[in-house]
Amino acid sequence: MLANSREELVEVFDALDAELDRLDEVSFEVLTTPERLRSLERLECLVRRLPAVGHALINQLDAQASEEELGGTLCCALANRLRITKPDAARRIADAADLGPRRALTGEPLAPQLTATATAQRQGLIGEAHVKVIRALFRPPARRGGCVHPPGRRSRPGRQSRSISSRRAGPLRPAGHGLATPRRRPHRHRTRPQTRHHPEQPAIRRHVTAKWLPDPPSAGHL
């Protein structure tokens, strides 16, 4: 990276503003469909390259500027000066920390932490969405709820697995029941109609039998 004077830096930004003004005034009516697509591709490449320039500025502010100079934290200063939200400002600071140039304690320049990603961004090959996905791959997993079990109170593996299974099956079961199981069709038992036995039923039966049924044949008639 070249060391430039303040006048040279101002000239570079002025020239960039002037070229953007010219580009804003041109008409694209003479272009064909493939040429329009190519123009959009070049514009996208330029848009992707611009954040790489801002990474160096943000890292320098983070390392050298005090809160008195900034009027608060770096996140608040960026949000106010650039007219963006604080979450967006925090994201830009995090991107600059991973993709921007760094310096060692001795002042020696260091490569970005995500060197390949930073190179691809400077070349306009990847954009903000790509950087977000790549940074998420290298970010350590966050602890859910920020809770850490104190020593001696860690749940046992069996209890923990049952707890996880219970939470996963919670929406699939009614309240107050165990784990959801496949529903079984109720067995249809065939029941005979039950009759109430009258106290005088045995006597009535003997009377009917003696009156309407013939007597059993005797041994002499066989």
Swiss-Prot record:
Span list, region Disordered: 142-222
Basic residues bias (residue ranges): 182-196
InterPro entries: DUF222 (IPR003870)
A GO cellular-component term linked to this record: plasma membrane
Superkingdom of origin: Bacteria
Family statement: Belongs to the Rv1128c/1148c/1588c/1702c/1945/3466 family.
Protein name: Uncharacterized protein Rv1588c
